[in-house]
Amino acid sequence: GYADWNSGFVNVHRGEVWKVTADFGVNFKEAEFYSFIESNVLNHAVAGRNHTVSAMTHVRLFDSDYTFFGKIYGQWDNSWGDDLDMFYGAGYLGWSGSWGFFKPYIGLHNQSGDYVSQKYGQTSGWNGYVIGWTAAYNFNLFGEDFVLSDWNEIELDRNDAYTEQQFGRNGLNGGLTLAWKFYPRWKATVTYRYFANKLGYDGYGDQMIYMVGYSF
């Protein structure tokens, strides 16, 4: 796929990015699991590339729609440094159907990173709270199948060192995606990637991502 940091509503001056992504998901009666891995900045030398791995699960509690929620989100950057976010908390799976789904969660935030503040020390350790969700809406337009989806996380009360690194006590991280299933197993997607005081950026920023994918 192709991404451009400079073509959203905010020009964050990070240029163009070529990327490769693979994802996997499975649903059981008792639990569900989703993960992805992506390699970014493939149009740059190895020293400027980065990689992201994420894994998320909901495990139902006592056959109810309430869940134990867990997630890891790791970024390994050859120039900026490494960062691993770990969330543990509770979620809900009761809002779903043929129309799509809305799956909220809330949790504690534990962080492991390379950044060391001269004033506050390491970012690693307790890092506040997270409120988030994943959502999708399925619809048909002009005889074509589309999915509008969103993932969103609000980070609250982050530690002093991470606040210094990310330019704020609270932060926002997410992406709004429109997917067109234009052929069996093939889809094209456009994602509006948004963030605030996250990804090492001061204030609100965004990115446009264009992908073509195949489902196995």
Model-derived regions, located:
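Repeated loop/turn-to-beta-strand initiation elements of outer-membrane beta-barrel proteins
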Residues: 30-35, 62-70, 98-104, 140-149, ...
